[in-house]
UniProtKB/Swiss-Prot annotation:
CDD domains reported in the protein's UniProt record: RuvC (cd16962)
Cellular location(s): Cytoplasm
Gene Ontology biological-process annotations: DNA recombination; DNA repair
Stated name of the protein: Crossover junction endodeoxyribonuclease RuvC
Requisite cofactors: Mg(2+)
Pfam family for this entry, one: RuvC
A GO molecular-function descriptor: magnesium ion binding
Active site, renumbered: D7, E67, D139
NCBIfam families per the UniProt record, alphabetical: PRK00039.2-1 (NF000711), ruvC (TIGR00228)
UniProt-annotated binding residues for Mg(2+) 1: D7, D139
Gene: ruvC
UniProt family annotation: Belongs to the RuvC family.
InterPro entries assigned to the protein according to its UniProt record, in alphabetical order: RNaseH-like_sf, RNaseH_sf, X-over_junc_endoDNase_Mg_BS, X-over_junc_endoDNase_RuvC
SUPFAM superfamilies: Ribonuclease H-like
Length: 161
């Protein structure tokens, strides 16, 4: 199973691809899609959609996992993040891929074993679990964590059904 994890954002959208073979998780690729902060929101969303569509076409994942929105203090930021999430989900659905969503607490629990883990702990565990030489760029590391969460949760759902 090849999983595309996405950490959506209107400024930077991180992506991470992993391959689950048996009980092993293998790193395939990771990166970030950057948008121009001075560009209109619609143009930024198109940049995100086009970038994720290219990643999907290049790597042919079998599923997509997206970080679910959190409750934000700034309503405008939350709305913009919601737009980025929608575009990320649309890229997956338009490629006929199943799309799953996970909260930050679920991701941290799956990766570190503690739902309130600090970001550096999550980044370090992603590095260890995927045998990376160094910690990935922050948004890409978050996306890899979402993909790892999906790999673990998908396996658990398989066992339960």
């Amino acid at each position: 199973m090849r999983i595309l994890g996405i950490d959506p954002g209107t400024r930077i959208t991180g992506y991470g691809l992993i391959e689950k073979i048996g009980n092993r998780l293998l790193h395939v690729d990771n990166g970030a899609i950057y948008t121009r902060t001075d560009a209109p929101l619609a143009d930024r969303l198109k940049t995100i959609y086009d970038g994720l569509s290219r990643v999907i076409a290049d790597y042919a994942p079998t599923g997509v996992a997206v970080e679910r929105i959190f409750v934000a203090k700034n309503a405008l930021s939350a709305l913009k993040l919601g737009h980025a999430r929608g575009v990320a989900m649309l890229a997956g659905v338009n490629a006929s891929l199943p799309v799953a969503e996970y909260t930050a607490v679920e991701v941290k629990q799956a990766v570190v074993g503690y739902g309130r883990a600090a970001k550096p702990q999550v980044q370090q565990m992603v590095r260890v679990l995927l045998n990376l030489p160094e910690i990935a760029q922050e948004d890409a590391s978050d996306a890899l964590a979402v993909a790892i969460c999906h790999a673990h949760c998908f396996h658990l759902n398989d066992l339960l059904t």
